[in-house]
Amino acid sequence: MKLELELDELWSFVFKKDCKRWVWIALCRQTRQIVAFVIGDRSAATCRKLWQQIPPGYRQAHGYTDFWEAYQKVIPADQHTACGKDSGLTAHVERWNNTLRQRLARFVRKTLSFSKSDYMHEVCLRLFIHRYNLSLLPKK
């Protein structure tokens, strides 16, 4: 089975909207699980951190992303396909972004709930991802 990843980034903020934080996500298309994430700015350096967070077995996978230039700089060309949302090749990670925004108030764009510290922003995201990934495991 050929592994495929969908990678995307979503905007969030800490304390006030001027303090932008970008959540970078790598989702395995076969299992729908999040295999890596990074919170940072929207630079190639943060994209590189995401790529380094991906487990070695998944780093051999083919990655589908949007056209954000950081992906072209970081992901090897033979493992990367940049595509538009209308292609459906990043539909699962886009759906996951919507699920995150739906279930965690601090990630909603217009909200009274927000993270007051980077630490809590990451802790809440880490807990959400952990629970999400566990929910995808087969029930015994």
Model-derived features: where do they sit?
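Residue-level recognition of single "structural anchor" positions
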Residues: 1-140
